[in-house]
Swiss-Prot record:
Gene Ontology CC annotations of this record: cytoplasm
InterPro entries: dITP/XTP_pyrophosphatase, ITPase-like_fam, RdgB/HAM1
GO BP terms in the entry: nucleotide metabolic process; purine nucleoside triphosphate catabolic process
The keyword Hydrolase appears for this protein: yes
Catalysed reactions, semicolon-separated: XTP + H2O = XMP + diphosphate + H(+); dITP + H2O = dIMP + diphosphate + H(+); ITP + H2O = IMP + diphosphate + H(+)
Free-text remark on how the cofactor is bound: Binds 1 Mg(2+) ion per subunit.
Molecular function (Gene Ontology), one example: ribonucleoside triphosphate phosphatase activity
Protein name: dITP/XTP pyrophosphatase
Active site: 68 (proton acceptor)
The entry's keywords: Hydrolase, Magnesium, Metal-binding, Nucleotide metabolism, Nucleotide-binding
Amino acid sequence: MEARVILIATTNKHKIEEINEVLQSCGYRVEPAAASKLEVQSNRLEDVAAYAAIQAYLALQRPVIVEDAGLFVEALGGFPGPYSSYVFKTIGIRGLLKLLEDVENRRAYFKSVIALAHSGGVEVFTGTVHGVIAEKPRGDRGFGYDPVFIPEGSSKTFAEMETQEKNKFSHRGKAARELCRWLRQYGPPR
């Protein structure tokens, strides 16, 4: 049986690969949509993803998902949180590590939100993984903060893991599994 396609409003090949690796288990796959991702500024990832998904649905007139994620560092009061992408583009991993110089508490968590917009409304799925920020970058896989995030239960950073291994731990993998459960229960969105 051929996998059913759901559009995703991203061109990030790493996100697409990670989400597809999970969705294949429920007979779906995502393909990038030719829609610009409009973001609203909010302290809540759920609001950002839901707004962007609704805008993409209105533009495409087809079911579409948007994934947004953030890294929340305990010692920095949850920073960069929903602004993780902007912070990564401006100060990068080096800047984050500089902020954590001489900081003992390196606990952090990644949160992923997948919003599915369809004719019946918007569904929001979340996944969270707790871990710590490494002292220095390790690994060459993945993207973003993957080289410095070590999930609980592992000694490797996300950037040292293959996609399949990363999805066992990852916030995005957990959110995608929630989406899969919804798709199994309710069938293909319209």
